[in-house]
């Protein structure tokens, strides 16, 4: 039948650049097709025409009946099948060898340029790289050519054409011979005078070989389908996923924020020197306990204090419950101012028992602000506001004015910081 060693060497080279399923397919091709066809099948079909006999003496009748019974010999049919299904693999091998050769030429050009620029050939310089730095390396860690890009497309087309050839030859074998050989074949073809009976040698053994080669072809077809799923379908599915959701891979690796970020509608995080400023004060039914302010002096100074918000002209809608909120804020600022300046000018109102009682009530009311009822909008603002108990920026204006006449509002003559 011929020597299959040359085709075997070529396919062995292609096996080095195939996937795992491709290597299994080539192993099946080597062992169960080429070796079986060369070792056993040729011996079974060796006496095929000589042992094909018909019960007639008409010249030429036996030949035409054999031609009708076997349009093509099984051996030659299977040989053509092996050649056709191996051709796409050989084309893929040619593409691999072309890429390897182009890489070798590129290295030779780099060495030639290096030798031309540096006669000492590489002392103090590395060879130039003509390719793009973004191009992936041609070989992997094991020194094998990577199946990617144009080479991957060639490999996929290789599998597709192998599958088509397998299906075509299986269908052709069914229409030509069927899957079973009968020992008796009746022929009425010219020049036979009438219907003659012809007999096939070793029909059972030949039927076994036909079924075996058909099973090997079906196994190769299944391997091709698995490899198409492994390469083509997975790559196609990955490409469609990346097309409709390009940030899916980044979202899987992106860490989640432990806390939600503050929106633009919320206030910025600032440090203030007085209690949190709520737009809706507590209901008058909430009663504050008179708790003394620790370390507070007995007589607050008579100073007019202008805060930074008042100087910038910010108007906050404040709803008073019997003037309690405004009085608390004024008393708080007076106490802070008294801590920063020595108490040299005690006022008559502060030294009186009524003034001392008012101081205790005001300090207790200011400390009770944290226990007031808070709306959801104010709760969101409180989360984004850092409250620190320290002195706010103060402006001392008209120290001689009495606290009874001051109402905490900004005057044209006040100086704001």
Curated annotation (Swiss-Prot):
Side Cytoplasmic, residues: 16-19, 93-158, 229-417
Self-association and partners: A hemichannel or connexon is composed of a hexamer of connexins. A functional gap junction is formed by the apposition of two hemichannels. Forms heteromeric channels with GJA8.
Subcellular location: Cell membrane; Cell junction, Gap junction
Keywords in alphabetical order: Cell junction, Cell membrane, Disulfide bond, Gap junction, Membrane, Transmembrane, Transmembrane helix
TM helices/strands, residue ranges: 20-40, 72-92, 159-179, 208-228
Intramembrane segment boundaries: 2-15
Superkingdom, taxonomy of origin: Eukaryota
Family classification: Belongs to the connexin family. Alpha-type (group II) subfamily.
GO terms for cellular component: connexin complex; gap junction; plasma membrane
Topology in the lipid bilayer: Multi-pass membrane protein
GO molecular function, one term: gap junction hemi-channel activity
Topological domains, Extracellular: 41-71, 180-207
Ranges for region Disordered: 110-141, 247-267, 334-417
Basic and acidic residues bias: start-end ranges: 110-128
Lineage summary: Eukaryota, Metazoa, Chordata, Craniata, Vertebrata
Low complexity: bias regions: 342-353
Gene3D superfamilies: Gap junction channel protein cysteine-rich domain
S-S pairs: 54-198, 61-192, 65-187
Protein name: Gap junction alpha-3 protein
């Amino acid at each position: 039948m011929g020597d299959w060693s040359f085709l075997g060497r070529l396919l062995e080279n292609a096996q080095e650049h195939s996937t795992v399923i491709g290597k299994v397919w080539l192993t099946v091709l080597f062992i169960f097709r080429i070796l079986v066809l060369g070792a056993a099948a040729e011996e079974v079909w060796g006496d095929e025409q000589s042992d094909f006999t018909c019960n007639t003496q008409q010249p030429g009748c036996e030949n035409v009946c054999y031609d009708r019974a076997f349009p093509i010999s099984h051996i030659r049919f299977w040989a053509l099948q092996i050649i056709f299904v191996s051709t796409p693999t050989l084309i893929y091998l040619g593409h691999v060898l072309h890429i390897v050769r182009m890489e070798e030429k590129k290295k030779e050009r780099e060495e030639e340029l290096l030798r031309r620029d540096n006669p000492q050939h590489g002392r103090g310089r590395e060879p130039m790289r003509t390719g793009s730095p973004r191009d992936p390396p041609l070989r992997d860690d094991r020194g094998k050519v990577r199946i990617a890009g144009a080479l991957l497309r060639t490999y996929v087309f290789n599998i597709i054409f192998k599958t088509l050839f397998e299906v075509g030859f299986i269908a052709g074998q069914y229409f030509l011979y069927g899957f079973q050989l009968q020992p008796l074949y009746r022929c009425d073809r010219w020049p036979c005078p009438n219907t003659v009976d012809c007999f096939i040698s070793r029909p059972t053994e030949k039927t076994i070989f036909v079924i075996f080669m058909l099973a090997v072809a079906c196994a190769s077809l299944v391997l091709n389908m698995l490899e198409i799923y492994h390469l083509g379908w997975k790559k196609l599915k990955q490409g469609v996923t990346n097309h409709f959701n390009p940030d899916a891979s980044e979202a899987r690796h992106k860490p989640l924020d432990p806390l939600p970020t503050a929106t633009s509608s919320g206030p910025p995080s600032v440090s203030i020197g007085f209690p949190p400023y709520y737009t809706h004060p507590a209901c008058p039914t909430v009663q504050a306990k008179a708790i003394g302010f620790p370390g507070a002096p007995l007589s607050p100074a008579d100073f007019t204090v202008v805060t930074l918000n008042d100087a910038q002209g910010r108007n906050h809608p404040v709803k008073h419950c019997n003037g309690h909120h405004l009085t608390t804020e004024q008393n708080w600022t007076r106490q802070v101012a008294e801590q920063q300046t020595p108490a040299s000018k005690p006022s008559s109102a502060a030294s009186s028992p009524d003034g001392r009682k008012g101081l205790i009530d005001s300090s207790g009311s200011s400390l009770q602000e944290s226990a007031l009822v808070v709306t959801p909008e104010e709760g969101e603002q409180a989360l984004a506001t850092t409250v620190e108990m320290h002195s706010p920026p103060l402006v001392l204006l008209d120290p001689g004015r009495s606290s009874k006449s001051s109402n905490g509002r900004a005057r044209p003559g006040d100086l704001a910081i």
